[in-house]
Swiss-Prot record:
E.C. designation(s): 3.4.21.92
Name of the molecule in the record: ATP-dependent Clp protease proteolytic subunit
Organism: Deinococcus radiodurans (strain ATCC 13939 / DSM 20539 / JCM 16871 / CCUG 27074 / LMG 4051 / NBRC 15346 / NCIMB 9279 / VKM B-1422 / R1)
One Pfam family linked to the record: CLP_protease
Annotated gene: clpP
UniProt keyword Transcription regulation present: no
């Protein structure tokens, strides 16, 4: 049985009456982008468009990107990554739940000092998948492209973590899972957010 996703709507009072927003459009008004699905072309186009819109509105004001992403297509993820690095507006990234594979690339693409994770989130790196399909004659061409993409991802992780490329290659041979604290030591994030209700001074 297929489960239908339900997108909540928010109703706001304006000078012209009531206005209805889907929850993601309402968050976008506050310069919040939510990455909560696997990375693929249509989703990447939407995220890129949101980044470009917010940058055009105010290139000085921070954009917050919340990430709960199981990973996905490398090409689509790199489109988002390059846009995050291209725009002038600073981007903070917050992992809620998980940032796996290309999700971890987006997490570490935030501005230095603004890459965060909630205490029970999980981060995972690996070589990634190009999603190739084809006939036997294409295998050699595809294999070369897979190696090219692997080298590209290693270069990106190296740029943001300063870890030796040899270590990154070893770690990325298999799924490499990390807690937020381990991701902090690894250099993927800058801060583990521990400001939950329990340690905000006993707020009810």
């Amino acid at each position: 049985m297929e489960v239908m996703s339900v997108i909540p709507y928010v109703i706001e009072q304006t000078g012209r009456g009531e206005r209805s927003y889907d929850i993601y459009s309402r968050l976008l008004k506050d310069r919040i982008i939510f990455v909560g699905t696997p990375v693929e072309s249509q989703m990447a186009n939407s995220i890129v468009a949101q980044l470009l819109l917010l940058d055009s509105q105010n290139p000085e004001q921070e954009i917050q990107m919340y990430i709960n992403c199981p990973g996905g297509e490398v090409y689509a993820g790199l489109a988002i990554y390059d846009t995050m690095r291209y725009i002038k507006a600073p981007v903070s990234t917050i992992c809620v739940g998980m940032a796996m594979s290309m999700g971890s690339v987006l997490l570490m693409a935030g501005d230095k000092g603004k890459r965060m994770a909630l205490p029970n989130s999980r981060i995972m790196i690996h070589q990634g998948s190009a999603g190739f399909r084809g006939n036997t004659p294409d295998l050699e061409v595809q294999a070369k492209e897979v190696l090219k993409l692997r080298d590209t991802l290693v270069d990106i992780y190296h740029k943001h973590t300063d870890l030796p490329q040899e270590k990154l290659l070893r770690d990325m041979e298999r799924d490499y899972f990390m807690s937020p604290e381990e991701a902090l030591k690894y250099g993927l994030i800058d801060q583990v957010i521990d400001q939950t209700r329990e340690n905000r001074g006993g707020e009810e």
